[in-house]
């Protein structure tokens, strides 16, 4: 990602054992100018001797994980997975040599490279690559270049859905969209507003050991489908905290069987071990831990629920950050919401905190209490955020448009001079002043938790 700081790029390069870069110079790393390389006398081919040394399971690329909740990790993507992804996704989307795919996600991201670009290579299709996503340019681009497919992450459609609606939004050549993160509340609206015929939603991770779960059926809100009796049914299991398989409809961590018991997910083998679970159901089996919570119904449809690090426990209940965020957005008063758990002195567990970019001013008492009433109608009492802060600009994101929660969790509720904060006190949201904050930090503020 060329927008990263020199220091971060240098750290990532050193940690990953990079010896040569092509393009942007990185301190202490030998760099080649791509324009000079293209002007050289290189034939464009690779010697047969060198090709014979490369196997399907050798790394094709190293993709850094997004780093939304911690440090980015270098994940390996083999030639086998790259070819397999291209075949699978080109078939799922009906891509052909006549197709044009609009790629506005970076090519150092799994969706941009392995899902979309590899499909174009496999199908012989045209990849229309934009430097970065733009709400304003989206429809103009797909019309200008006659793109019939678009790769996405959920945030892309959330930003587009918040843009002013035009009468001709549906007059565009896009027929199929594919990616992950298109939630149930957005699904039908996106198809209707933009005139899209089909969605292929999936669940996957850059470092996962097998093919992604895909939902090609068009059933809204689901990220995967494995019909009962299919050979792959037993290769994906959902388990509880004690690694017992959960019943249909219940939520559990997704485990994927490692094919052939051979797994290389990261450049650092120690990181591989942290993701694996051995001898779980029978001697010699090997499973990859996703760290994500999913549910599966009796028909075999999977729904993404939350990341395990994206939930917190309060009043003996697990609170899903995603569920609370969706409730906040559904009020119609908020443009962007980030939910996370924060510690309160003297209390066990974590209370919910939401950092909110409102559409209009929320600070006035009645408006804020109307907002609280809406949340109380949508959420159980333990799910209503106890602390909210209001911001005037979009939150900091990764290069793949994912909001970085780690920094917000570190800040907690101590930036009251910089952002207006409100705390749920005596049944309503009140301004968190310096005096109230001091009382809260000393455990002297009775918030009615007990």
Predicted segment positions?
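Short beta-strand->loop structural element characteristic of the AMP-binding/adenylate-forming
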Residues: 1-20, 73-76, 103-104, 125-132, ...
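ATP-dependent adenylate-forming carboxylate-activation enzymes
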Residues: 1-11, 25-27, 125-144, 319-324
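ANL superfamily adenylate-forming
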Residues: 20-56, 83, 210
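Conserved pre-ATP/AMP-binding loop-to-beta segment of ANL
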Residues: 44-64, 71, 94-100
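Conserved AMP-binding/adenylation subdomain of ANL enzymes
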Residues: 83-100, 108-149, 163
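Gly/Ser/Thr-rich phosphate-binding loop
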Residues: 122, 139, 144-152, 161-222, ...
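AMP-binding/adenylate-forming catalytic core of the ANL superfamily
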Residues: 204, 242, 256-286, 291-383, ...
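AMP-binding/adenylate-forming catalytic domain of the ANL superfamily
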Residues: 379-403, 419-447
